Amino acid sequence: MNAIQKYFKDRQSLIDQYAKGDMTKREYLQRNYEAVIYGDIGPFRNMDTLEKALFNYQYYNALAKEMKTVSTTRDMDYELKRDYMEKSNYYYSKKDKATLTALRMLDYKGVEAYFIKIRSKFLKGKLFEIVIEEEGIILHSTSTLILKCLREEGVFQEESRKSVIDDYVNRRY
């Protein structure tokens, strides 16, 4: 088992613990963040395999969520909050690059995407889910570029659906 496979195995264990109620969403996010940051692998410059692209997705998603969480700290200086939000947005853009790389590697085959029903007013009509059936992979994005590509490839369903992981995406952290 290589380092990426070990990460995804450990991540699945965290998901299972979260699903059983053994940890909160915040605890799950923190443990996943620690796994990508302190693991023996970092982001890949050359995403030449689906595995590497999906790891980069997880890596940058974890960093983006952590920066966003830090930005909500009470009594933090406005400039510092803004810096953390900018970092969060930067990491989300890197995550979207990894998403596009993965979709292109798959040539959009076995991919289905749609907007998800979400409680957040800010994300309603923006957040969509990408399901890669054969791999059992669920990705999320708000990227208009990715949305455009999914539509052009004919894999985006113009409807809002309940997310495959509805409890997770609609739970605050």
Task: Show the residue positions of the predicted features.
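Short terminal alpha-helical segments
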Residues: 3-30
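Non-transmembrane amphipathic alpha-helical segments
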Residues: 11-14, 57-71, 98-99
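Charged, low-complexity interaction regions
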Residues: 17-27, 69-82
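Short linear proline/tyrosine/threonine-rich motifs used for host-factor recruitment
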Residues: 23, 28, 129-132, 137-139
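Short, charged, amphipathic alpha-helical segments
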Residues: 26-32, 77-96
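Short, charge/polar-rich alpha-helical segments
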Residues: 39-58
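Short acidic DE-rich linear segments
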Residues: 168-173
